[in-house]
Amino acid sequence: MESQAATPSSLSGESCTLDLPAVCDTSSYEASQRVSQGSSNSLSSLESHPFLSSSTTDPDSNSLNTEQKGSWDSENFWLDPSSKGQLETNEEEDGLRKSLDRFYEAFAHPLPGSGDPLSASVCQCLSQTISELEGQESQRYALRSFQMAQVIFSRDGCSILQRHSRDTRFYPLEQEGSSVDDEEPTPGLSREVIRFLLEQTVMKDS
């Protein structure tokens, strides 16, 4: 019986001795797990807090880049031939328009002492039409045509209109009412302006 009783105790001691490496292995495994978890946590913390960019760490460089970009944009505007050419073209057109307006205003009145009431009436009719066309960009060509006609009639009189008037009494019957298209055009005088004036009351009463 004693031999049998000693046997289980010896077996339990042996089992404890045999189980000890397993316990050691388990503790070492847990230690390695803790190390790996610590390293993974440190990596995740690094990922969640990315490194600061150069623009954040150096505000002076950011402002410098903004100033350089602004200066480059302004330089590109002046160095761009299309932008500069367009600006110069607009200025030239404005200057030319103002010069033409001054020219037409200075020579759009009958010469003093001409004594031609028809020329005065025609110029007054043209002045009214010009006032209606001023400020309309779509009628810029018509405006210049009427202004040039006013200058020509103020200088040369209205003999051109009288030749085409149906009620004129200044020319033989075979020449009355001659077509505007059949006559050689007067430089600077539009046929459309002549047709317009022939339809006005001032010419029908002449």
From Swiss-Prot:
Residues 56-74 have a biased composition (Polar residues). Keywords: Chromosome, DNA damage, DNA repair. Pfam families: SHLD1_C (PF15021). One of its GO terms (cellular component) is chromatin. GO terms for biological process: DNA repair; negative regulation of double-strand break repair via homologous recombination; positive regulation of double-strand break repair via nonhomologous end joining; positive regulation of isotype switching; somatic diversification of immunoglobulins involved in immune response; telomere maintenance in response to DNA damage. Residues 27-94 are annotated as: Disordered. It is found in: Chromosome. Residues 32-55 have a biased composition (Low complexity). Component of the shieldin complex, which plays an important role in repair of DNA double-stranded breaks (DSBs). During G1 and S phase of the cell cycle, the complex functions downstream of TP53BP1 to promote non-homologous end joining (NHEJ) and suppress DNA end resection. Mediates various NHEJ-dependent processes including immunoglobulin class-switch recombination, and fusion of unprotected telomeres. Component of the shieldin complex, consisting of SHLD1, SHLD2, SHLD3 and MAD2L2/REV7. Within the complex, SHLD2 forms a scaffold which interacts with a SHLD3-MAD2L2 subcomplex via its N-terminus, and with SHLD1 via its C-terminus. Interacts with ASTE1. PANTHER family: SHIELDIN COMPLEX SUBUNIT 1. This is Shieldin complex subunit 1.
